[in-house]
């Protein structure tokens, strides 16, 4: 797959939908409003502390993804990158749940973008922004 297009290329089969849905359900059950106990659950603790706590974790995990990818560039085992991406996804799923969203919302957005060049999409966004600015009095 090229970096500027989301056109499908022979990719390995992905069987993550069920796992993501199960994890999303667990995260949802750990919300304080659903009885999540911050003393017994890491997810409940992050959600109880509020957005600053889980957003900080997302930033940390994103940095760890970058560092792991750089390590792979220098010969490290790629499984470390997978491990760090899993942490990033997990904490991102906590944010999604907090804001009333689910992995299915992200999948729907990726499907919407499928087959669209990133360059074309960026140009369209700029065009729409320009039109909105011109429409303002």
From Swiss-Prot:
Pathway(s) served: Amino-acid biosynthesis; L-histidine biosynthesis; L-histidine from 5-phospho-alpha-D-ribose 1-diphosphate: step 2/9
Region named Disordered: 114-137
Enzyme Commission (EC) number: 3.6.1.31
Gene3D superfamilies for this protein: MazG-like
Class of the enzyme per the UniProt entry, highest EC level: hydrolase
SUPFAM superfamilies, per the entry: all-alpha NTP pyrophosphatases (SSF101386)
TM region(s), chain numbering: none
GO CC annotations on file: cytoplasm
Protein's cellular compartments: Cytoplasm
GO function term, MF aspect, one: phosphoribosyl-ATP diphosphatase activity
UniProt keywords, alphabetically: Amino-acid biosynthesis, ATP-binding, Cytoplasm, Histidine biosynthesis, Hydrolase, Nucleotide-binding
GO biological process: L-histidine biosynthetic process
Biased composition (Basic and acidic residues): 114-124
Catalytic activity: 1-(5-phospho-beta-D-ribosyl)-ATP + H2O = 1-(5-phospho-beta-D-ribosyl)-5'-AMP + diphosphate + H(+)
Top-level taxonomic group: Bacteria
CDD domains in the record: NTP-PPase_HisIE_like
PANTHER family listed in its UniProt record: HISTIDINE BIOSYNTHESIS BIFUNCTIONAL PROTEIN, HISTIDINE BIOSYNTHESIS BIFUNCTIONAL PROTEIN HISIE
Family classification: Belongs to the PRA-PH family.
Protein name in UniProt: Phosphoribosyl-ATP pyrophosphatase
Record organism: Paracidovorax citrulli (strain AAC00-1) (Acidovorax citrulli)
